[in-house]
Amino acid sequence: MKRLLTLSLVLSAALVGSVSCTGSTEPSAELFQPYKTTALRTPSVPLVVSDPYFSIWSPYDQLIDGTTRHWTNDEKPLDGFLTVDGQTYRWMGAERTILATIVPMADEEAWTAQYSRTVQPEGWQQPAFAPGDSWQEGQAAWGSDGLSYVRTHWSDLNSDLYVRRTVNLKADDLKEDLYIVYSHDDVFELYINGTKVADTGETWVEGVQLHLDAKLKALLHEGENVIAAHCHNTTGGAYTDFGLFKNIGISNAGIETAKQKSLDVLATNTYYTFICGPVELDVVFTAPMLIDDYDLLSSPINYISYQVRSTDGKEHDIQLNVIATPEMALNKASQPTNTILMENNGLQYVRTGTVDQPILAKKGDGICIDWGYFYIPAANGTVTVGTDAADKPLLCYTHEFGKTRQAASFMMMGYDEIEDIEYMYKRYKGYWAHGGTVSIFQMFQRMRSQYQSIMQRCREFDKMIYDDGLAAGNEHYAEILSASYRHVIAAHKLFQDDEGNLLFFSKENNSNGCVNTVDLTYPEAPLFLCYNPELQKAMMTSVFDYSLSGRWTKPFAAHDLGTYPIANGQVYGADMPLEEAGNMLTLAAQLCKLDGNTNYVDKYWNVITTWADYLSENGQDPENQLCTDDFAGHWAHNTNLSIKAIMGVTAYAEMARMKGLRDVADKYTARARAMARKWEKDAREGDHYRLAFDRNNTWSQKYNMVWDKLWQTSIFPAATMEREVKYYLTKQNKYGLPLDSRKDYSKNDWTMWTAAMAGDRETFLKFVEPVYKYINETESRVPTSDWYDTKTGLMAGFKARSVIGGFWMRVLEEKLNNRN
C-alpha cells in the first residue's frame, strides 16, 4: 500500500545527496497575477498535467486538504513547504497515512475466500450464515480478465458477486489506527460482521481508504471476524478486492498550516496565494499546452512558479521545498523503484522510475504508468534524495532565498515515457521528441531558457479562452471553459507516425480505456474546431486509414483503435454503426467547410460514400443498435440517432457540393430532407419529440440537430428546433437538463450542444447556469464528471474525459457566424 513521507526526516538529516544549479531568469511579478480572477470552485484542480498518465490534481478546496492525486484517484503525492525565519508552513499536500498490512489485498497476496455468483438471501453477510451449495472457494481478486491481479474470473453483465472473508485478529490489532482499503467495479457494498460500512452506488475506484473510527472499529473483535462484500457489475469491467491495514504514520509536529488566500483556474495556469506568517507565497502551476505549438502541446514538462512577498516590510529568511515520491512512476505502490541523482549537460536532476521498466506492457482504463522516468531538475535550486518513515525515497527540490523582502523563481517537473504509444504495431514517442532526436534533457533546457516567453504566451492564451467564453455567454461560461481546457488536452497523446501523419489520440478515461474512440472524438470536437482543426483531423485520420487499408471492412466507421496505449485495431466488443458513421461524416464536413475545400477527405471519398449510403439506408428508423447514450439501455427507433444519420447524409451532400459533384449533392440533400420530413412526423408528440419513434410520453436531448443550425442547411424546419428547446426548459432540474425522460442523470457535454441550439444568448445561458452550479457544488471531487445526476449533483460515472471539449459548441457557433 501507499508509503508516505514524514517531513521531519526530510528537513533534517535524511538527505543522502544534493546538487544544485542556478542562473535562470527570474519571473516577472505580472506572471503571478491571473488575467481574470475566477469564482468557480473546480471539483478537482489541475496542477501538473500533460497526458493520460502524467496527470496530477488536487480534488480539494484547499491545496493542503489532502494528497494530490492522479485522475484515477491514485495518490501522486506532491508536498510543498515554506520555511520563514525557522518556522515551516505546509502549503501543499497533507500529512498522510502510512498503511501497513494486517490482512492483504490481491497485489500482495492471492488471498482466499468463499464466494458466490448467485443472488443471496437476507443475512448472507452475517457471521453465523452457513454458505450453501452456491458458494465455493476462490482467490482474489475477482473480476474481468486483464485487470490487475484478477485470479478468479467474473465479468458477466448485470451480475452479482458475494464474498465472505474470514479474518483473525489479535488484541493488539484492535489497538491500531485501522483502515479497510477496497477496489471495486461497479456497485459495491462492504460489511463488517454483518453491519454495512460502505455503499458506493454505481462507480469504479481503486484503493479507497475507509478509516475505521471508534464506532466502526467496535464492529471488530478479537478472534474470528467476517468481512463481506457484494459487488454488482452493470456493464463493462468488473472487480472486487479488499483488505485491512494499520496506520504507522508519524505526526509532523511543529509544522504550521499555510492559509490559502486565493485560487484562480484559467486555461493553462492555476494560481494560488498563501499566507505563511509575515510572508505571502504565490504559486502558479502551468501546463504550457498551447494549441498551435505542437512541441509545447505535447511537452511532458510543467512549470511551477513561486514568489515570496513580505507583508510587514521586513526581510525574512525564506526557504521553499517541494517534495515528490516514486509513486509518480508507479502503477502499484509495491513495485520496486530506483531513485537517483544525475547530471546532464551541466544541469542536475533527481529521477525516479521502476526497476523493471515494462515499456508499453500495460493497457487499460484505471491504471497508472510504470515505465519511463519522472524528473525534477535543479534549474533554480537544489535537488536532493531523502527518505520517509517507511525508508522510501523522496525527491526533493529546495530553493534557498536567504533574507529577502520579495523574490521569485520557478521549477520544473517532467516525465519521459521513453515510448509513448503503439500504433499499428509500431512504437512511437510523443511529438515533442521528434522521433527520438530530442531528449528529455534537451526539452528541459528549452523550457528553462524560454520560460519568460512561454509563460507570456500562456497568459495570452488564457485571455483568449476566457474572452471567447465571455463574448459567447457570460462570466460563468468563461470560467467553465477556462477550467476545462487542460482537462481536455491532458486526455490525449500527440505524435507523428512514420508516414508523417499528425496523430492525436484520446484515452477514454474512466469508461473502458479505449484509444481514439470515435464517440469521444465527436463530442469533444468543438474545442479543436474552434482553435486548431488540424488536431481534429489528427483524431480522425487513423480511423479513415483503418478502413482505407482494408483492416476494417464494415460499411461504417470503427468504434476505436484499441486500448490505450496500444492502438492496433478495434477492441470494443460491439459496433455502433449509425453512431460512428454519422460522427465521422459530420465532422469531416465541418472540417471541409473550415478549409474551404475537400482536400482532407478526397483520399477517403470511397470510404465516405460507403458510410453515407449506410446512413441513408439504415438511419431513418434505427434498429436496436448501440449508441453513445445507451446508459439506461439501448432502444430501437432512437430519434436522436436518426437525426445523427440525417445530418451525416447532409454532411456527405455538403462535401459532394464542395467537390463539384452537383448531381450527387442534390441527390443526398433530397434524401436528407425526405428523411427529416418523415422524422418530424413520426417523432412528434404534441409540444416536443419522442426519445424513440414508438415510445409515447418520452423525450430526449436532440443535440445532433445543432449542425443544421451551424451549417444553415435548414434540413429540419426552424420550428422543430425551437419547439424542442422550449420544451427542454420545462424539464430542467437543479443541476441541469436530463439526457432523456428515463433517468435524472445527464451528460453535460451534450447539454452544452443542446444549449447552442437556443436562438438567443439569454436562452443559451438558461442551460449553462445549472451546469455551472453543478461544477461549482458537486460533492464528487474528481476532474469534472460529464455523467451526473441533475438532482443530486453527484457523478453517475466518468471523470477526466475529453468529451467536455463539447463545452465550446457555442463558441464554435460564434466563430462560424463571424466567418460568414
Spans of model-derived segments:
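Acidic/polar, glycine-enriched structural segments that form the non-catalytic walls/loops
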Residues: 29-45, 96-126, 225, 250-256, ...
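Extended, loop-rich substrate-binding clefts of extracytoplasmic carbohydrate-active enzymes
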Residues: 145, 149-157, 251-299, 377-393
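Aromatic-lined ligand-binding clefts that engage carbohydrates, nucleic acids, or primary amines
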Residues: 135, 159, 167-197, 227
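Carboxylate/His-rich catalytic cores and anion/metal-binding grooves
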Residues: 67-98, 187, 249-259, 521-563
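Aromatic-rich carbohydrate-recognition surfaces in CAZymes
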Residues: 404-405, 437-454, 513-622, 638-652, ...
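Extended ligand-binding clefts on enzyme/binding-domain cores
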Residues: 342-385, 508-520, 526-533, 552, ...
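Well-ordered alpha-helical scaffold segments within catalytic/enzyme domains
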Residues: 56-60, 274, 305-311, 464-471, ...
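Accessory carbohydrate-binding/adhesion or oligomerization-edge regions at the termini
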Residues: 30-34, 44-57, 61-65, 96-151, ...
